[in-house]
Amino acid sequence: MELSDANLQTLTEYLKKTLDPDPAIRRPAEKFLESVEGNQNYPLLLLTLLEKSQDNVIKVCASVTFKNYIKRNWRIVEDEPNKICEADRVAIKANIVHLMLSSPEQIQKQLSDAISIIGREDFPQKWPDLLTEMVNRFQSGDFHVINGVLRTAHSLFKRYRHEFKSNELWTEIKLVLDAFALPLTNLFKATIELCSTHANDASALRILFSSLILISKLFYSLNFQDLPEFFEDNMETWMNNFHTLLTLDNKLLQTDDEEEAGLLELLKSQICDNAALYAQKYDEEFQRYLPRFVTAIWNLLVTTGQEVKYDLLVSNAIQFLASVCERPHYKNLFEDQNTLTSICEKVIVPNMEFRAADEEAFEDNSEEYIRRDLEGSDIDTRRRAACDLVRGLCKFFEGPVTGIFSGYVNSMLQEYAKNPSVNWKHKDAAIYLVTSLASKAQTQKHGITQANELVNLTEFFVNHILPDLKSANVNEFPVLKADGIKYIMIFRNQVPKEHLLVSIPLLINHLQAESIVVHTYAAHALERLFTMRGPNNATLFTAAEIAPFVEILLTNLFKALTLPGSSENEYIMKAIMRSFSLLQEAIIPYIPTLITQLTQKLLAVSKNPSKPHFNHYMFEAICLSIRITCKANPAAVVNFEEALFLVFTEILQNDVQEFIPYVFQVMSLLLETHKNDIPSSYMALFPHLLQPVLWERTGNIPALVRLLQAFLERGSNTIASAAADKIPGLLGVFQKLIASKANDHQGFYLLNSIIEHMPPESVDQYRKQIFILLFQRLQNSKTTKFIKSFLVFINLYCIKYGALALQEIFDGIQPKMFGMVLEKIIIPEIQKVSGNVEKKICAVGITKLLTECPPMMDTEYTKLWTPLLQSLIGLFELPEDDTIPDEEHFIDIEDTPGYQTAFSQLAFAGKKEHDPVGQMVNNPKIHLAQSLHKLSTACPGRVPSMVSTSLNAEALQYLQGYLQAASVTLL
């Protein structure tokens, strides 16, 4: 694409069309842009439009399109073509900073994001002058430009907050500090002075405070990994100014908005974060500044209102106190009883109150409420911060704090008892306070793992939680119901089993509550209880204990999916899945109804899949239905096929990308349930599974391979006789997979199934070509993962076709190649093979090479016989060699999978690990001893002589042990 006016005009027209609400106009325009984005100059045309277009809407559209283009294409992925040519990359980096800084703020943000995406890949090595260009702009004095630089620097450097320590990271941070720390400090001082100069100019202050917020965020990022020498030397400058800003109050910066935090609140919030970082990580250096910050932040807390706009500030201020109070250095600041009482009364209790805004979220924005309350995304809420402060104080002052709070809890419960319908919020705060007080350590998976022994959790449960849940009206006091259910979830490991068992029917009733939060919590609590483990690692609750409630449990769970707002509620679907898993055959009588409901739900959500977790659990539930029913009655598989195939066909025909991998996995499960040959309905699908377009989506690959393996296991004879013309297509899939470092193991899974199951004559003509492809890949790109898979394959081939066939195919490709493979690959690398089945395949294969391959005994290969035996004994006895060459540490590959598909999206569609050797060999060591005995019978004297002269002493000792265990000797 040339950088011409005509192309700019065309691009403008198509960008305009992408904004059209009519899909008939919008979609073709989007498709056109996708089709041309691979052309040279395409990104430069977008940047030129940004600069030259007079239409602001087109400029914004071009900036968003450019950012998304960079996001999709900038990263260079191994095994894939470079999507942006080098000339375009150079031109983009040369122009983008200047363009970003000279653009209006709306466009500046998009380009700033694009720079940070490029920077993540290219900075510093491939973009060394980026920092210099940015720092030079500080001199401009134009705060529009300066804020653009700061925003970009923030998006570039914020990853330092969560990167793992490494030499590479230190080197980069040092480079950034050398170039950036001094100019940033000077800018900080200059901006503070300008704030004084312009103290009465509201518009100037807004720009300057935006800068101070970004500068404070950069301070946090640059100080996160370690305390840089520069910032230690300049701590006085930073901390004095932070303290001044923390105590500053300028009426011009106050806002009327009760919801949205203003610039002053955002700046103070960030300063609280910065102070907490120093108090936690650099307490020695920060010690002399700390008392001033504690006082300032305390004053801030007792003077700040309850409005939502102050939430972030208050929660960060409380988090600062929480991080300080649990450090031994600062214990003395809190140990006075009056101080503790004051903190409880003035900070903790007021910030645990259930406010009108919380009530509004509970009723009208339940999804967000649940996300915050249940999933721990409440990191910035007042309640969460107050809870953390309680935990922090309990670290050193558990007794006094528990005593103070017990008084508050009792008085709150008394207030509630006086008039429950008016004072229910008092009980809500009491429950929250007890939860905060009792929880010392908590995980998502297990609830509370460590509790405050001074709080009687069971007594509180019986007296104050159970009565609310036993109330006949499930819709009364919904917040308290949700609190009670959450209490069960959190303290499920502390409350005795008999009380939990009493709760189960109550939770089942609450699945019918109108409140989305209440019925969601009820489903989640049931799901968590059903996963609890007893002393012997079996589930704590047995199917027999839940049996009395089976019908009402299943009915209420499926009814809950029909309640307003919960048609795709992931917690309910997860509870359905977990109930199936726990109850097993107890659900069989209900399956016909349940599978109909699941199928209808699947059809409905396939029109517009928008809830990935819900969809996942739905497919898991379908798999469980199939597994449980067909285990009891394999013939029932036909009923499932009748119920599901119509929907599956629609999903495949409409190319519902999110569901296709799931459909293939369920079909694999169904096909594997057939014990004999493949039904014709599956065979009709077989040719379609080989279409290249399906294999282009990496998400499909594991599921497709699994399905093809099922075809090969169940119907290899049918394929060989009725679909022999499809074998080249099958091998074409193998060839594509083997060429990719990310998917080569999937190629081996497919190849192993072909070798194991297909009639030998149907693949004879392709065998040599298969080996040539594997050797080409070995030559071009040898990785540890590939070698492990290759070793399993050649040994499986040896078991299937015989040792001599393996030697002949190697030497048929190139003379003496068999010896090279033994010497360069099998002997040195066999130790790397992992997994019991994989090791067994290799052991049996190598045993065959040692004892059933005549050239190993009487040609130039004989010298490799003992080293091969030694390597096999090493495979049995030495620890696995899990070293990876240095150059492979940074290859982005999955953990090395085993012989069967390690990746299985659906846990309940997973298949048992398949052992192709099976009962043929139970104990590979005994098998080796027996095979050596047989060989020594055929050529007396030779085997003992080779073993005694060349095998090292330790290996010889192990071998004698195998011979003894097998009750055989070498002749």
Curated annotation (Swiss-Prot):
Residue positions where Phosphoserine is found in the record: 112, 931
GO annotations of cellular component type: cytoplasm; cytosol; extracellular exosome; membrane; nuclear envelope; nucleoplasm; nucleus
GO molecular function: nuclear export signal receptor activity; small GTPase binding
Pfam families hit by this protein: CAS_CSE1, Cse1, IBN_N
Tissue specificity field: Detected in brain, placenta, ovary, testis and trachea (at protein level). Widely expressed. Highly expressed in testis and in proliferating cells.
Modified-residue entries (N-acetylmethionine), positions: 1
Any one of the GO BP annotations: protein export from nucleus
Keyword Kinase part of the UniProt annotation: no
Keywords associated with the record: Acetylation, Cytoplasm, Nucleus, Phosphoprotein, Protein transport, Transport
Residues covered by the Importin N-terminal domain: 29-102
Subunit structure: Found in a complex with CSE1L/XPO2, Ran and KPNA2. Binds with high affinity to importin-alpha only in the presence of RanGTP. The complex is dissociated by the combined action of RanBP1 and RanGAP1. Interacts with CFTR.
Protein name, UniProt field: Exportin-2
Organism in which the protein naturally occurs: Homo sapiens
Lineage: Eukaryota, Metazoa, Chordata, Craniata, Vertebrata
